[in-house]
């Protein structure tokens, strides 16, 4: 954490100022724009909703605005970790987060609403089919929309006056890679550790050692001081004691770029993939909606094919997205 700014080394964004190339800054700060516009939590969520309605999704129900939590309450303690909820098997969808005027929260809103619009899309399916095609699809849907929060999109909605030139692309891509690509090893190892524990391959007296062995194998990181079996470091990750599967986040990192490439093509985007936004594209919205409405009623390869035309998950879209950054690193 003292080196990378994250206790699990799952996000390396905090080292960006140390590694980004000179002259490659984005040219704008979305956080500063949101603050200067005095854009409050409700308007930030309304902006996220308008992204989805621009794709021809129905607006969120009135109950969403009354029952969601957007601001940290002053009269009680709450868990501010952002989450999306579907509460009555009909149309009572909500989000729960303590929204600040930051670029991160602006993107998170677009992500969390992806869960809500997915939940509404499969609402008319039998109850057993009211879920995503596999665990990764739910996370990937919101992440896909977050990939469309580009400078081009910010210009269209009036938050930027002009699109920065291509010289800023390396810095923007580096920032996203430090969050997305750096996450992949950690996203893979959490459930690898859990499966080894459940199978008995790792015994209780080696829980912590097995955790750090995987951290070193996949992430190349080691503890700053000795961590014996008197510690239980995996338990510091919320998803372990909460019994929440973690592979879904690894899969989502692959799927979101595959979804984004397919939808960008449907939207007719001819720019480099990292500059494409599907905002306002009803054809892209129709393709996305067709997949979301399937819910869990079909095997996940069918849902993937409905959106991308392929039946296998494919990381080549991630490679395509970061191609300009890869070329810069090669130089």
Region spans (language model):
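Post-HEXXH active-site segment of zinc metalloproteases
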Residues: 98, 107, 119-145, 158-160
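A short glycine/serine-rich beta->alpha loop
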Residues: 100, 128-132, 238-245
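Short pre-active-site segment immediately N-terminal to the catalytic Zn-binding motif
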Residues: 34-39, 90-110
